[in-house]
């Protein structure tokens, strides 16, 4: 067996039995999901605006739930589209922790999460409303991290084939596991961050 195959097999075992922390601050609320021992630990703070205080919230959350950052295999960061300033603050905090603790950091985006929550696959496009603008992507392209999306001030009149979201639906580590199992994440060395236009 060659080294590349062994590396992929090892990563897939790590992803399936993973312990990770997902951080989402793209749409004005803070969502933390920690998966450990097949259990989800979740914190949701609606209308969270103080990203400078994020590190204290993260550490308190781990302490209150008897979790240990050292046990994580990786962090997963939602890169948008959405707010940029808070995301930048949180991303720098996580990358610092990851550097010190030798923990991997992966990125994903809102379109990947949205696709995992859409039950009716009869839709052709998905639209995410952020600050009175619609970020629109073909549903078939949502798995492709780098595929393009369009930004519009309003939806098309004939938008019955577009599923619209004004916020992310509730999601769990199972939605994130889909991204991991299909290797749809992006490595932190290549992070594009979707900025509000």
PLM regions: where:
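Nucleotide and nucleotide-moiety/phosphate-recognizing core
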Residues: 38-139
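Oxyanion-binding and handling regions
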Residues: 2-35, 51, 106-197
